[in-house]
Amino acid sequence: MRTRKAKDRSRLIQAAMGQIPCDLTIGNVQFFNVITGEIYPASVDILDGFVVLVREEGQEAVLPSKSYYDGQGRYLIPGYIDTHMHIESTMMIPENLARAILPWGTTTICTDPHEIGNVMGLDGVRFMLENAKKSKLRQYVLAPSCVPSLPGMENAGAEFLAREVGELLDMDDVIGIAEIMDYVGVIHDSERMHTIIDEGLRRGMFLQGHAPYCFGRELAAYRIGGPVSDHESVNADEVRAKLRAGMHINLRASSLIDNLSFLVDGCKDQPWRDFVSVCTDDVHAKDLLTVGHINNVVRKAVASGLDGREVVKMATFNAAREYGFDDLGAIAPGYIADIQLVDALDGSRPKAVFTEGVLVAEDGKYLGGDCKTADYDLPNTVNMPQIAGPESFVLRVPEGYTGDTIRVNVMVSEDGNRILRHVEPVELPVRDGAVDISGDPTLVFVCCANRYGRGGKTIAVYRDFGHHFARQPQLHRQLPRSEGRLPRRRDPARVRRRCLRDRRRAGDAHRPAGCRPHEPEALRRGRRRDRGRAVRARCHQRRTAHPAGDRHHGAAGAAERGHYGYGPRQRRQPDVRTRVCGCGSINQPETEKG
């Protein structure tokens, strides 16, 4: 599938032959050819947003281009492609999402708007499509297949059946059916899923999968049912099984689930990995600003043992082949000029990013204009009268129950990564007619509530979900810090001491001119210990020399203080003046004698 048609193909042919000048040449680069795996010096000529020629070293241009960008010896690679993403998780509109991820090298995303579809139906999906057209980020949409996600188990703001999915598939920039989460319905050939999948198959469109813990006969039935990819593998064995079954695997690193290292273990021992690409799924705005987007997946995959060149290929060429994009994912004649310049093939932030041959980001800054507020005409859909305060999240026992404990089905995560593994019955105490989990810091309450004003909510108990969140302040004291289940309380004094320790270890590297060198901590403690001994010795001498007349050290002073002399309960503190140097560290205190 060609994602963009050239306005005038004849012009591209003429530019390739050197008969007309190109718009842009990116030169002085180390060209990474994701098709062959080679790296060699080259220059790339671009016209009308397409690559027309890759000139190897020694091949001169016939006509100079209108503009030239010096790559300064950096690697030239294609723009990253995210094979599966929910824009709603970023809390941004598509137009503003481009500002956040283009500087990180992502130039194409394939999105599933089922979250806004669950709330606003077709109107919500249309809004995402129209707003995406205003950005310089290439955004393709897949029609949500499971709205609601679990029919009969939840209430949604809309319902997508075959008719609604077919209507979406006929829209521009809709390229397939999004994650088919009802894999049970697929393998049992339910009428609802069968008719929805048929809408995509009749049009020859991409069918995206979503089938965690799927093996053997069930996996075979799911693959035959239509889906060709999966991003929900939870361990290495599942990755191997799905690759062997002919499914595309999307290595995922999201803000919610981070099990990428386990997934890499399942594919790095395979000799061929052409069916492996990458995705982010759900990523929060904070992570986009701090660690990036697809480049963060690349970084983690490299850290897990994969070769940087192969991971870049997964994030570009493999991703494009998965969707059948014939003009994306590589830098070659006839391909769209979505390009980035990077210092290394390790997921680092790009120096420059181009979409269709236009510079859109440089040095981590978006060059496409100011952030905009969407023309939002969708109604407010959040109406939750059943959530009125803390009492709304109390799990009550059945009326008339008089026992001290009650058996509760507790949901349990796998390895603390928030993937629901199983449910286990647990005896929990009852207090004031409600389940009490205060004695177990690994338990939290979770609540699922209807947000459409229809009332109703469900409260359950979850174990090991709190690895990533602090529930109550007192739990920091109850839970041993060595277990690492909850973050430590941030003590300003502790933070300052650690900063001073780090600066001392760094030596003179962070010390401004004129600042005295930091004393070793052992010497500093020794000086304080010697000072205390000297003060106690002087006190003893004064008590001996003035047993009755010294107000501060004699009997009168002792009577006034309620005990004799300066013992362990009360020590005279010298007047200390602390000097702080320009680097923020504390130099040796100076003592004024009284």
Regions found by a protein language model. Name each.
Residues 25, 67, 79-81, 278, ...:
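Residue-level marker for buried hydrophobic side chains located in beta-strands
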Residues 82-93, 149-162, 228:
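Active-site mouth loops of central-metabolism enzymes
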Residues 2-16, 20, 98-206, 511:
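Divalent-metal coordination cores built from histidine and acidic residues
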Residues 86-88, 114-116, 144-149, 180-183, ...:
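Active-site beta-loop-alpha junctions enriched in small/polar residues
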